[in-house]
Regions:
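Extracytosolic ligand-binding ectodomains
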Residues: 3-14, 24-381
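N-terminal signal peptide c-region/cleavage motif recognized by signal peptidases
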Residues: 19-21
Length: 381
């Protein structure tokens, strides 16, 4: 009689063993700039979370979402909390380059894969051992800077002025456009910086105009990119104005208003998927996301699509990791990292083909050039 409990207990144990390594929930931690200066990036990303499924490969997914308020210290705090308290298997975020750079320490120290939603190539620099655990979905600055320089050259631009954020995003873009401009035979004649929350850039713009460049590139992201644009318009600047893919969202158009007309920028193809030929590789995926997003939240944003691309990557990588380990373990996190590093999937922005030396994996298929015309994005063909 003493042993009557043993057989059902043994049966339960055997059933658990036969169920395989994937019996636990998969916890995905997300930290976004849902408030603060970068909120126009983080809000559509937060919205996109609501569109995602709660299971992958038959396993329950817990999306744990935090707001870092566009603050680097808060982003790192969130990352550490997600890892130590919520025991996440992977981190997605943050929305900006400075925040993502700050978070890397927590991801690397804990051996937790991280998918950044920010643009700078510094985040995944292959020469930095920290980046073994770090991936990202937005296009690298270098890829987009090359497209900007080619457009400038085609428009006859010989001299360029630059004004950008006084942080890692702005510094990264300045370095890349200098490289691309030199290749295109364009001389950078003036450089200025400003903070994301600066209410005015009058002094910087006056210095830029005094240098008489034929074009000016604004190295900014989100609605703060409108500040120099509006000042240039107020000063009646006649040259061409370029922006980065960091402003490709409806809030920028709303804030910049008519002062944005004529501005040129590179962006992911999903922003103007209707204007692409049916042969475009990402058109179908982009259309599916945009349709789903706009049905619930209104006008599309490239930034929400960056988060959706992170989901697409995970939807392919998680089934591979489940073959090797159980969620909630360091072995699963390592297997997930390995699977992400071997990604070859079509996203909303481009085709991700990753390897040990490239944790972004996007190429020319991930960029198009657009112009702002009457508060709309128009594809430059």
């Amino acid at each position: 009689m003493k042993c009557n409990w043993f057989l059902p207990a043994l049966g339960a144990a055997l059933a658990a063993m036969l169920a395989g390594p994937a019996a636990a929930d998969i916890n995905i931690g997300v930290t976004l700039a849902a408030t603060g200066p970068a909120a126009s990036l983080g809000i559509p990303q937060k919205n996109t979370i609501e569109l995602l499924p709660t299971s992958i490969a038959g396993e329950k997914i817990n999306w744990i979402v935090l707001d870092d308020a566009s603050d680097t210290t808060k982003a790192l705090t969130n990352a550490r909390k997600l890892i130590s308290e919520d025991k996440v298997d992977v981190i997605v975020g943050s929305s900006t380059t400075p925040n993502s750079l700050a978070m890397r320490e927590a991801a690397v120290d804990s051996g937790t894969p991280m998918i950044s939603l920010a643009a700078s190539a510094q985040i995944i620099n292959p020469t930095d051992p920290k980046t073994r655990w770090i991936f990202k979905t937005p296009q690298n600055d270098a890829l987009m800077a090359d497209a900007v320089a080619v457009s400038m050259k085609a428009n006859g631009v010989k001299t360029l002025g630059y004004i950008g954020f006084a942080d890692a995003y702005g510094d990264g873009w300045l370095a890349e456009i200098k490289r691309s401009a030199q290749t295109a035979g364009i001389k950078v004649v003036a450089e200025e910086k400003y903070n994301r929350n600066d209410p005015s850039v009058t002094g910087q713009v006056l210095k830029l105009i005094a240098a008489n460049p034929e074009a000016i590139l604004i190295g900014a992201a989100g609605t703060p990119g409108a500040t120099p644009a509006k000042e240039l318009a107020a000063r009646n600047y006649k040259g061409k104005v370029y922006q980065t893919h960091g402003v490709a969202n409806p809030d920028f158009l709303r804030v910049v208003g008519k002062d944005g007309n004529g501005e040129i920028l590179p962006t992911g193809p999903m922003l103007v998927y209707e204007q692409l030929p049916d042969s475009n590789e990402v058109k179908k995926t982009a259309a599916a996301y945009v349709t789903m997003y706009e049905k619930k939240f209104g006008t599309r944003s490239t930034f929400g699509a960056h988060l959706y691309d992170a989901y697409i990557l995970l939807s392919k990588a998680i089934p591979e990791a489940l073959k090797k380990a159980k969620p909630g373990t360091k072995e699963f996190r390592a297997a997930l990292r390995d699977a992400l590093e071997n990604s070859n999937v079509v996203g909303t922005h481009g085709v991700f083909v990753m390897n040990a030396n490239d944790h972004n994996g996007l190429d020319h298929r991930a960029r198009v050039m657009v112009k702002v015309e009457n508060d709309k994005w128009v594809l430059i063909k």
